[in-house]
């Protein structure tokens, strides 16, 4: 993973990871049968608090019921617990939730009770990447958005979404606007990927604009 970056970004990543260690923290992966209902309840608490901090932009999609229903599916779940060094991983101060299927790992949601520099990067990116490599997982998707992701080696890719408007006049306006919006998004993907801090690596850029329908 580190070898794919230029020298400057390798130093940055090592520095960010070291900062978390110097804060007296370590991150442990808790997967499958080791995940208890209590841990899922804690994860919900972290998630809810994180969404609350962002107010109207919090995008709170998941409910408490979702986390309680996730218990039977825990063979597909991985929790990354940030805790004090030498202490119980089941007593976290921050957590992230990932989903695993085959050789794919998906991450998106996290939360923390403390503000520590680079903790988000460690819990959401570096620790899951390290765990995925050890498990032979080939693909890790950290979720949508976030310009900071490119500094951690994540290639921007376009994703399709489906929307429906029930007001015909408004739907017509949106439909006419979509081709331009999609073209602009693809240009942004190209621009983001052109700035990836890789060293001599071929970067798969966005597909031709015709690949996404308006």
Q: Where are the regions that the model predicts?
A:
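A conserved beta-strand-loop-helix scaffold within acyl/acetyltransferase catalytic domains
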Residues: 1-118, 163-164, 196-214
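Acyl-donor binding region in acyl/amide transferases
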Residues: 102-168
């Amino acid at each position: 993973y580190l070898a794919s970056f230029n020298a400057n970004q390798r130093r940055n990543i090592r520095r960010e990871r070291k900062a978390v260690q110097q804060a007296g923290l370590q991150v442990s992966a808790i997967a499958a049968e080791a995940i208890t209902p209590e841990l899922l309840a804690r994860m919900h608490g972290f998630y809810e608090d994180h969404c609350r901090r962002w107010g109207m932009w919090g995008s709170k999609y998941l409910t408490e019921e979702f986390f309680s229903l996730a218990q039977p599916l825990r063979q597909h779940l991985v929790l990354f617990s940030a805790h004090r060094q030498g202490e119980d991983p089941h007593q976290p101060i921050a957590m992230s939730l990932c989903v695993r299927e085959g050789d794919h790992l998906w991450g998106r949601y996290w939360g923390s009770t403390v503000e520590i520099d680079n903790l988000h990067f460690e819990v959401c990116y570096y620790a899951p990447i390290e765990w995925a490599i050890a498990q032979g997982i080939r693909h890790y998707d950290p979720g949508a958005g976030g310009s900071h992701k490119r500094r951690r080696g994540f290639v921007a890719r376009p994703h399709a979404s489906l929307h429906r408007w029930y007001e015909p006049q408004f739907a017509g306006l949106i439909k006419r606007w979509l081709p331009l919006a999609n073209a602009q998004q693809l240009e942004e993907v190209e621009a983001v990927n052109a700035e990836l801090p890789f060293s001599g690596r071929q970067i798969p850029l966005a597909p031709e604009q015709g690949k996404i329908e308006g």
